[in-house]
A protein has these predicted regions:
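Short, basic and Ser/Thr-rich N-terminal targeting/leader segments
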Residues: 7-9, 129
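Short, small-residue-biased leader/transition segments that mark boundaries at the very start
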Residues: 1-6
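Structural signal for conserved beta-strand scaffold positions within catalytic alpha/beta enzyme cores
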Residues: 24, 46, 135-137
């Protein structure tokens, strides 16, 4: 499914096999109802949690790049990743991986804690502890889950 990223043919993925489905959603910028619809009822999801907004704002990137990252065609912040996740959670979701973290504008622990806080405090019936949420590692294989 197409995303809003500012590159050539940006896409997210939804892979289905029988009754099971997994999704990969990075380079989102902002999300809309179309993206939410493509990511609903997944068994597992790799979701972009690219940056902490404050770290990006005070970081070393030039102004134009900060504006692009924060814009509709940029990257999804930790906070917005958590808010999107609130709309996607359901009782049968088996795994959530946070990915595409910025090396300069994020920390694994910060992404995890921010997303978990958004889920726990968000407008949904779940708490973050109800799900296996983990940060996808850059340099090694993440936990393998069966869907």
């Amino acid at each position: 499914f197409p995303t809003r990223r500012s590159s050539d043919l940006p896409v997210g993925y939804r892979v289905e096999c029988g009754e099971h489905s997994v999704g990969i959603a990075t380079d989102l910028g902002k999300y809309n109802e179309y993206i939410v619809g493509n990511l609903q009822n997944l068994d597992a999801l790799l979701l972009e949690a690219n940056h902490d907004i404050r770290m990006l704002q005070v970081g070393k990137y030039p102004y134009y790049l900060k504006q692009r990252i924060l814009g509709d065609r940029g990257h999804l912040s930790n906070e917005n990743a958590g808010r999107l996740l609130c709309r996607l959670l359901h009782d049968n979701m088996k795994g959530i991986f946070l990915g595409h973290l910025s090396r300069e504008n994020n920390y694994e622990e910060l992404a995890y804690e921010t997303v978990c806080s958004e889920v726990t405090l968000g407008d949904n019936p779940y708490k973050s502890r109800d799900f296996r949420i983990q940060v996808a590692q850059r340099d090694c294989i993440s936990e393998v889950i069966t869907v």
